[in-house]
A protein has these predicted regions:
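Recurrent small/Gly-Pro-centered beta-turn motifs in extracellular repeat architectures
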Residues: 27, 67, 108-110, 163-166, ...
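Residue-level recognition of beta-strand termini and adjacent short loop/turns
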Residues: 59, 156-157
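Repeated scaffold domains used in trafficking and secretory/extracellular systems
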Residues: 8-16, 51-56, 92-98, 146-153, ...
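Surface loop/turn motifs at the tips and blade-to-blade linkers of beta-strand repeat domains
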Residues: 5-7, 46-50, 87-91, 136-146, ...
């Protein structure tokens, strides 16, 4: 497995009689979108593509990912029906994405040659098809020099994003909170000398918090301002089960 899907769904209470959690993941070669339920010996292939990105489970229990082919947006419904649409990205590649809590806006990390920028698009469904359109760059202040290279993104609320970024290729990747209108970026703390590899949003009853995975396998939970709590070590992927 290369990456595991995260979800917008707040986690329910688990009882001893609850069925095993359902996981969605991208295969190690990034060519298959997989689903598996804990306790089962069967792994189901939901969709295939090229260089599939970390998927996300939406509130309607559909699963969304991107393929580098063309490029293509892939959504698999809760009934197993697959919808795919070629997206006009103007020659860019999607390296990461996150769907907003409203299930309409999608934050995108867009690779343009050697640069990576942040964009936002609108998701819509019409007549059994899914579309991503009106993609625009999220403007960042010229003072936000540490965000010249963005590597990952997750929604913290309807108006706030957590992004991982650095100033130069050889720099350390750290987390920032930004407002979607691009009015400013706020550092969420220099955690360690090790770069952050991935960020996901953790839905809770009190709101949403960021969880980041460091390149050394340390998993950290954002609790307040500059405070981060270590959860685990030796981790290779981070997600929230659906």
């Amino acid at each position: 497995v290369a990456e595991v899907a995260s979800t917008q769904l707040t986690m329910p209470m688990i009882s001893p009689r609850s069925p095993g959690a359902i996981w969605h993941a991208v295969s190690a070669d990034r060519r298959s979108l997989l689903t598996w339920q804990e306790g089962s010996e069967d792994i189901q292939v939901l969709a295939t593509g090229v260089n599939l990105r970390r998927p996300q489970v939406l509130r309607d229990h559909s699963i969304m990912t991107f393929s580098d082919t063309d490029p293509t947006l892939i959504v698999v419904g809760s009934d197993g029906a697959r919808m795919s649409t070629v997206v006009d990205l103007g020659g860019c590649r999607v390296t990461s994405f996150s769907v907003a809590p409203d299930a309409v806006r999608v934050a995108l990390v867009l690779e343009r040659g050697k640069t990576r920028a942040l964009g936002i698009g609108l998701l819509s469904r019409q007549e059994g098809a899914v579309h991503l359109s009106h993609i625009t760059d999220i403007p960042l202040s010229s003072s936000d020099v540490n965000l010249s290279i963005i590597t990952d993104v997750a929604w913290l609320s309807q108006t706030r994003l957590c992004v991982l970024g650095r100033a130069i290729d050889a720099g350390v990747t750290t987390p920032y909170e930004i407002v979607v209108d691009g009015s400013g970026a706020t550092s969420m703390g220099q955690l360690t000398a090790t770069s952050m590899a991935a960020v996901v949003a953790l839905p809770t009853e009190m709101g949403t918090e960021a969880v980041v995975l460091c390149e050394d396998g340390t998993l950290l939970l954002h609790e307040e301002s500059f405070r981060w709590r270590q959860i685990l070590q030796g981790v290779s992927a981070v997600a929230v089960t659906a």
